[in-house]
Regions:
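A generic "binding-loop/recognition-motif" signal
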Residues: 32, 41-42, 60, 76-77, ...
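Short acidic-glycine-tyrosine-enriched beta hairpin
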Residues: 59-77
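Double-stranded beta-helix
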Residues: 2-6, 79-114
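A short glycine-rich, His/Asp/Glu-containing loop-to-beta-strand
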Residues: 2-43
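Glycine- and acidic-residue-biased ligand/ion/polar-headgroup-sensing regions
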Residues: 41-54, 58-59
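Short beta-strand His + acidic residue motifs that chelate non-heme Fe in jelly-roll/DSBH
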Residues: 35-36, 55-56, 72, 78-85, ...
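A short, compositionally biased micro-patch
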Residues: 29, 41, 48, 73-75, ...
Length: 114
């Protein structure tokens, strides 16, 4: 059975993983916002399964809806925000040589995490 990890913005669960990939289901509550962050060892690909997202990658803002997807290159500053009135569901795919939850550098976080 997969375990759900609760976060201040919602939750996630790992759907599948291998040596060089990980797939997660992320749920972001309305108004929820992940930290502005980057990763040294992995790139990410996000698929919007349902809801409306504002995604910042570098200096660009992207508004995505159900069935849209976006690639986040390794080392890029990025942020995910639920701009809809329902839960945002994102399928997040990680790719890289070191897939660790601690591979995160936070630049800004509304929940005051480091």
């Amino acid at each position: 059975m997969k375990s759900i990890v609760n976060k201040p913005w919602g939750s996630f669960e790992i759907i599948d993983e291998g040596e060089k990939y990980k797939v997660k289901k992320i749920i972001v509550h309305p108004g929820g916002k992940l930290s502005l962050q980057s990763h040294e060892h992995r790139s990410e690909h996000w698929l919007i399964a349902s809801g409306f997202a504002e995604i910042i990658i570098g200096e660009k803002i992207h508004n995505l809806k159900e069935n849209d997807n976006i690639f986040i290159p390794k080392g890029s500053k990025h942020r995910l925000t639920n701009i809809g009135s329902e839960n945002l569901i994102v399928i997040e795919m990680w790719f890289g040589d070191k897939l660790d939850e601690n591979d995160i550098k936070r630049y800004e976080d509304i929940y005051n995490r480091n």
